[in-house]
Amino acid sequence: MATTTRRLATEEDLRNTPDDGIYELVDGEIRMSLAGGAHGKTSMALVALLGPHIRQHRLGHVFGPDTGHRLPSGNVRCPDVSFVRAGRFPNEVVPTDWVNLSPDLTVEVVSPSDRLRWILDKVGEYLEAGVPLVWVIDPQKRRATVYRSLVDVRQLGPDDDLEGEDVVPGFRCRLGDLFD
């Protein structure tokens, strides 16, 4: 009986993906993210609020979904929004290639095509990589889940404030403002 061996995708394969979407390298597979309108609107609303706060207070660098972060697991993940504190890049030079460190904040915005298992896998991987704050925002349900660890988890509704806590000091916005 013949067996077939599946070749694991590499970072080189990821570099050679077409420019028609956002791809991640996860456990030797190339995965493409399919985002909808509510996903894009919510992500951009958050960046429009978070970005100026980070720049004004010189807290660090905010990145969009096309930025790959090479995690200790070897996976290259592209959070919808991510933040890296000032002082973490050598000489404060942001790399032109993938970011070779775990963000301080990752944000995943839920899309209709997302499976709960994929989201939880991402959250677990981010936390295991040392990301101190993870937000999962669901525009369809108008809620967010805030993770500091797998046991320190809070649910937020549209009237609750999404806060940067000690990771993005002073940042606060009403969650519902991201959906309106």
Where are these regions (language model features)?
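Gly/Pro/Ser/Thr-rich low-complexity, intrinsically disordered segments predominantly at protein N-termini
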Residues: 1-180
